[in-house]
Amino acid sequence: MKVNLQTEFKQTQIQQVLDDLDRELIGLQAVKTRIREIAALLLVDRLRQKLGLSSSNPGLHMSFTGSPGTGKTTVATKMADILYRLGYIKKGHLITVTRDDLVGQYIGHTAPKTKQVLKNAMGGVLFIDEAYYLYRPDNERDYGAEAIEILLQVMENQRDDLVIIFAGYKEKMDRFYASNPGLSSRVANHVNFPDYTPEELLMIGKIMLQEQQYQFTPEAEEVFLQYIQRRMQQPHFANARSVRNALDRARLRQANRIFATPGQNLTKYDLVTIQAEDILKCRLFQ
């Protein structure tokens, strides 16, 4: 008996998901390569099953590390789709949660909360953002450890029904795993999301504007790149998320600039164009 790799690959339609990932995310080549590697492993494992070869279910739980706004949630959504198309999960949906969704504030509250989240996520992927906040060793009365114990049981006993992705800053996630070796041993796939370069963030910003039918003037584009370079040096920078916030404020200033001269006849160009002054009025340039 033989199986045709190309036929199997086409039937799963995972190439469409990988193409979407390439198109929707600027840069992140190492991340995209890692996702392709995981997809290849899962496809080959599926072929082994078809030929009756021994196939221990590959560890599917994952760790996504990196700063906010680097595409972790987007990639998690695509990963859920890949797992679904390959038959590793039954539904393919993604549930995103944080500590507050899992941990209660009093005795007996955490277990029901965590179990309800897990019930909702069954058949799909559970994405736990800033997972390290589940563990607070400095507080003996914290109930996060109870949530972790329940997660460990499900990761081991129901791994055919649910994939869990733990996400957050790399340094904090490393400490989280070091403090929870039982958890670390169950997470087979680690994917690191690097910060974007200023040029990549400019490209992301231009795409965001195009999606909303806006555009930069050439001067505004240069100024926005300068803005990004300055903003990256400031606290709480969140990559693409910070770019989106900056563009929202630029649109607000553009609207106020137009509104300040009510007598003029406006063209489509006037309404879609972000000028350099719409960016230069932000605090970073003052």
UniProtKB/Swiss-Prot annotation:
Top-level taxon of origin: Eukaryota
Residue numbers binding ATP: 66-73
CDD domains: AAA
Chief location of this protein within or outside the cell: plastid
Subcellular location field: Plastid, Chloroplast
Cited PANTHER family: AAA-TYPE ATPASE FAMILY PROTEIN / ANKYRIN REPEAT FAMILY PROTEIN, AAA-TYPE ATPASE FAMILY PROTEIN _ ANKYRIN REPEAT FAMILY PROTEIN
The protein's role, per its UniProt record: Necessary for the expression of RuBisCO.
The protein's name in its UniProt record: Protein CfxQ homolog
Native organism: Cyanidium caldarium
Lineage summary: Eukaryota, Rhodophyta, Bangiophyceae, Cyanidiales, Cyanidiaceae
GN (gene name): cfxQ
